[in-house]
């Protein structure tokens, strides 16, 4: 995967929302949005997989604590199409993160690290970011 956007010092607090809009590559295999304290401490690893690591059209979410991955959570909802422009909204809560997909479907992922602020955002893979907004 090519290295994409990395942003730090975001200071996203509980109750706030991060919107990421971008273009999925026409030949997409997978892309990643990571949120957390830094690259070794992620409260959310959001990884839509078109065809990667044995997963087909599956969203894999995880956390990373001190460099160690947690248990994966898989979502079968998959509203992503290669070559399309999509928006993902991630609402940061004290106990969990709510991810709203482009088709309006929402699911939650626990804030396993109990972070009080998200400082780090990284995007990677077959996804070109067009806009990042904070609400």
From Swiss-Prot:
Q: Which GO terms describe its biological process?
A: apoptotic process
> Which is an annotated GO molecular function term of this record?
laminin binding
Q: Which residues form the Galectin domain?
A: 4-135
One GO cellular-component annotation of the UniProt record comes to: cytoplasm
Q: Modified residue N-acetylalanine is at which positions?
A: 2
Positions modified as N6-acetyllysine?
A: 13, 19, 29, 128
Subunit and partners: Homodimer. Binds LGALS3BP. Interacts with CD2, CD3, CD4, CD6, CD7, CD43, ALCAM and CD45. Interacts with laminin (via poly-N-acetyllactosamine). Interacts with SUSD2. Interacts with cargo receptor TMED10; the interaction mediates the translocation from the cytoplasm into the ERGIC (endoplasmic reticulum-Golgi intermediate compartment) and thereby secretion.
Q: Which Gene3D superfamilies match?
A: 2.60.120.200
Where mainly located? secreted
Q: Which positions carry Phosphoserine?
A: 30
**What are the record keywords, sorted?**
Acetylation, Apoptosis, Cytoplasm, Extracellular matrix, Lectin, Phosphoprotein, Secreted
Where along the chain is a beta-D-galactoside bound?
A: 45-49, 53, 62, 69-72
Q: Coding gene?
A: LGALS1
Q: Taxonomic lineage per UniProt?
A: Eukaryota, Metazoa, Chordata, Craniata, Vertebrata
In the UniProt record, does the keyword NADP occur? no
- What's the name of the protein? Galectin-1
Q: Where in the cell is it found?
A: Secreted, Extracellular space, Extracellular matrix; Cytoplasm; Secreted
Q: What does this protein do?
A: Lectin that binds beta-galactoside and a wide array of complex carbohydrates. Plays a role in regulating apoptosis, cell proliferation and cell differentiation. Inhibits CD45 protein phosphatase activity and therefore the dephosphorylation of Lyn kinase. Strong inducer of T-cell apoptosis.
InterPro entries reported in the protein's UniProt record: ConA-like_dom_sf, Galectin-like, Galectin_CRD
